[in-house]
Curated annotation (Swiss-Prot):
Segments of this protein annotated with the region Disordered: 1-28
GO CC terms in record: cytoplasm
General function of this protein: During stationary phase, converts 70S ribosomes to an inactive dimeric form (100S ribosomes).
UniProt protein name: Ribosome modulation factor
Record localization: Cytoplasm
InterPro entries: Ribosome_modulation_factor, RMF_sf
Assigned protein family: Belongs to the ribosome modulation factor family.
Gene3D superfamilies cross-referenced by the UniProt entry: ribosome modulation factor like domain
NCBIfam families noted in UniProt: PRK14563.1 (NF011162), Rmf_CrpP_fam (NF041886)
Length: 57
């Protein structure tokens, strides 16, 4: 069970990162559950920071 939960959270973080790189708004987060939403937003923030610092185009 823990592995499935971790994979789901990692997937949410990965999708958030991709959304951030593509310039999507954080308001477009598809998740309603607080824990999963926080992982998605964390990925989104990481991508925005990477993009602003010039690590990604």
């Amino acid at each position: 069970m823990k592995r499935q939960k971790r994979d789901r959270l990692e997937r949410a973080q990965s999708q958030g990162y991709k959304a951030g790189l593509n310039g999507r708004s954080h308001d477009e987060c598809p998740y309603q559950q607080t824990e999963v939403r926080s992982y998605w937003l964390g990925g989104w923030r990481d991508a925005r920071n990477d993009k602003l610092s010039g690590l990604c185009k």
